[in-house]
Amino acid sequence: MGAALSSQWARLLGEATGDEARGARVVAWHVRAADSDWVSRVWLGAQNDSGLPAPAIAVDGSEGWWVCFALPPQPSARPQAEAVALLRELIRSWLNQGGAGVSDKDAAAWRFACWPNEAPADGVPVPRQVGPDRWSAFVAPDLVPVFAESPWLDCAPGEEGQAALLNKLQPIPAADWGRLLAASAQGASGRALQAAGDGEAPAASASTALQGDPRAFLLSVMNDPGVELALRIEAARVLLAHG
C-alpha cells in the first residue's frame, strides 16, 4: 500500500519497536458474519452510550468483521490485557442494552487482535489479501448490511478510500479511558465483595470506595485481590501520576 494508508496506520500505531510495541494501540474485536447486526449496535453504543469516538469497521476477508478501537496515545502501547478486558466489558454492555443477552461465557469466547503487537511486518493490518479474490477492507457503517453474508471484497480496495475511512478513527481520549477503567474497577470490586460474602477485608474495601474519596478508592482497588490484575495495575498508575 502507498503513503496515504501507511501514514494513517503510523498515526495510530506509532513507530515503537521492541518492548514499546508489545501491547495495544488499536484493538480490533472480531464479529462472526452470523452476528453482523452486532457491528452497528456496537458502533452506535460506543458513541451514544459511552461518548467515545466511532470505531472503524472492516470486513475481515473471510468469516466476519473487525470493529476497531484506537486507544489513548501515550509513549508506549497500553497493556494488552487491560485494553481487551475493558473493551470486552464495554462491548457486552452495549449489546445487552439492546437486548442481546450476552453471557459472561459468551463474551469470554470473543476474539480480539491487538496492534501493533499482532500487526503484520508492513504495519498495515487492513486492507490485506487473505485468499483468492478475498480482501479485508474498511467499509462505511451504512454498508454493513451489504456485506453481512459475504464479508470480503473481491479485489483490492482503493487506497485513498481506505485512508479516508481510517482517518475517521480517532483515539479514545485519555480522560474517557481513565473514567471507564475506574468504573470497571469499581464494578469489579463490588462483584468481589458480593462473592466474598461477609469477609472483613472486602467489606472494608467497598466501604472506603463508597465514601467518595478518589485516592482511597484507588488504593482499595489496587489492594483488592478480587479485582483483575490489569485494573489493579491501572489504579497504581493513576496514583503514581497524581501523587
Write out the residue ranges for each language-model feature.
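Generic alpha-helix signal with a bias toward terminal, lower-confidence helices
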Residues: R41, G178-L181, S189, A230-E234
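Charged, helical or coil segments that form electrostatic protein-protein
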Residues: A195-E234, L239-G243
